[in-house]
């Protein structure tokens, strides 16, 4: 299990949430007041960590949502070829291949150490811009 639960009212901008089983960073939260026929609702707008897709959901404020547990790790770049990067984890020495993001392609060189995030069975290189 790489997620935990939290109520909608506990969420804040900048934190993470699972929407359609995709980890997303919250960019906007608006809470409505309780009305005559229902409880307060929270509207969450978030952007996918791995696909940069904008997602929006509406839940009652007492609704439990899934929060992904994101592991932040470091890896050494072994090689860069054909839009793929071969990495070796700095702690476990496990080697794995990730697709190369065109935005960071010119910044990644063999031998350098890069941070990457791992959650829900997915990994992504997270270089600082």
Curated annotation (Swiss-Prot):
Pfam families assigned to the protein according to its UniProt record, in alphabetical order: eIF-5a, IF5A-like_N
Keywords of the record: Cytoplasm, Hypusine, Initiation factor, Protein biosynthesis
Principal cellular location given in the protein's record: cytoplasm
Modified positions (Hypusine) in chain numbering: 36
InterPro entries referenced in this protein's UniProt entry, alphabetically: IF5A-like (IPR001884), IF5A-like_N (IPR048670), NA-bd_OB-fold (IPR012340), Rib_uL2_dom2 (IPR014722), Trans_elong_IF5A_hypusine_site (IPR019769), Transl_elong_IF5A_arc (IPR022847), Transl_elong_IF5A_C (IPR020189), Translation_prot_SH3-like_sf (IPR008991)
GO MF term set: ribosome binding; RNA binding; translation elongation factor activity; translation initiation factor activity
Coiled coil start-end: none
GO cellular component, one term: cytoplasm
Protein name per the record: Translation initiation factor 5A
Organism: Thermoplasma acidophilum (strain ATCC 25905 / DSM 1728 / JCM 9062 / NBRC 15155 / AMRC-C165)
Lineage of the species this protein comes from: Archaea, Methanobacteriati, Thermoplasmatota, Thermoplasmata, Thermoplasmatales
């Amino acid at each position: 299990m790489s997620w935990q639960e939290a109520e909608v009212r506990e969420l804040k901008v900048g934190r993470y949430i699972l929407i359609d089983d995709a980890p997303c960073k919250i960019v906007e939260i608006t809470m409505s007041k309780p009305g005559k026929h229902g409880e307060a609702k929270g509207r969450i707008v978030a952007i996918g960590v791995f696909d940069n897709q904008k997602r929006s959901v509406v839940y009652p404020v007492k609704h439990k949502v899934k929060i992904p547990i994101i592991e932040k790790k470091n890896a050494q770049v072994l090689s860069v070829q054909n839009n793929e990067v071969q990495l070796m984890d700095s702690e476990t020495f496990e080697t794995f291949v990730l697709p190369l993001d065109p935005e960071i392609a010119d910044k990644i060189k063999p031998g350098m150490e890069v941070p990457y995030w791992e959650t829900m069975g997915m990994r992504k290189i997270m270089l600082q811009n």
